[in-house]
């Protein structure tokens, strides 16, 4: 697989490394991820039986989803380029007494080239909108998964509504995320992600929207994919 070793923005790594101490604070900078995580995990469980499975969590950060996966899967590997976030993830997994998690500081391109067709399940949540070449990430993810394996992506659509809700609303009004977390030009339409996936030999199984209710501060699945959405693919 032809790959680039610089498929990341240094300012993105710096940004996430600076707020490392807040990864496991449910009321801190990653408040929205803590609220969203049960929905993401349930979505994965509804589509894939995780027991006995080997999973890879791409862009794992502080390990919020990684730890959830480890409560069901046989072995989970979390990879990220943010060294400080991985340090937090490793310490927290020890506190949680989860011994079936491995963390590695690596790009998905490098990791999956070394571990081709290694995983049954791969998750790449809220990451694609933070890299220069998301199509390359999708291709690398496919390389690391076995034929018949499951891949899950979540990201944000690119349109006026998503700009108003995911950036203006979430970052500046509701303060669910730190200001500057997302750049509009880096957001991804579902059709674009599906096109990249098809090039990577991935078949779309499900596309679901994720809606936020600010009154009771909860996320739920919906048919509306105009802002946040998740996609489930099978390889082959």
In which residue ranges do the predicted regions lie?
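Short, flexible, mixed-charge acidic loops at enzyme active sites
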Residues: 162-172
């Amino acid at each position: 697989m032809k790959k680039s070793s610089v498929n990341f923005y240094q300012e993105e790594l710096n940004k996430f490394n600076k707020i490392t101490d807040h990864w496991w604070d449910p009321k801190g900078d990653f408040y929205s991820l803590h609220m969203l995580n049960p929905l993401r995990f349930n979505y994965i469980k509804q589509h894939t039986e995780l027991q006995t499975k080997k999973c890879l969590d791409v862009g794992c950060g502080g390990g919020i989803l990684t730890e959830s996966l480890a409560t069901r899967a046989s072995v989970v590997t979390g990879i990220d380029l943010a060294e400080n976030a991985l340090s937090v993830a490793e310490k927290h997994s020890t506190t949680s007494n989860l011994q079936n998690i491995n963390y590695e500081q690596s790009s998905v391109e490098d990791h999956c080239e070394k571990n081709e067709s290694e995983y049954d399940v791969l998750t790449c949540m809220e990451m694609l909108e933070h890299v220069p070449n998301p199509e390359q990430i999708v291709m690398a993810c496919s390389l690391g998964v076995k034929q018949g394996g499951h891949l899950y992506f979540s990201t944000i659509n690119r349109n006026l509504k998503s700009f108003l809700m995911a950036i203006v609303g979430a970052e500046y009004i509701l303060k669910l995320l730190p200001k500057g977390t997302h750049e509009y030009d880096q957001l991804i339409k579902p059709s674009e992600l599906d096109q990249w996936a098809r090039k990577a030999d991935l078949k779309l199984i499900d596309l679901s929207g994720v809606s936020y209710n600010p009154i009771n501060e909860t996320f739920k699945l919906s048919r509306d994919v105009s802002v946040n959405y998740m996609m489930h693919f099978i390889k082959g």
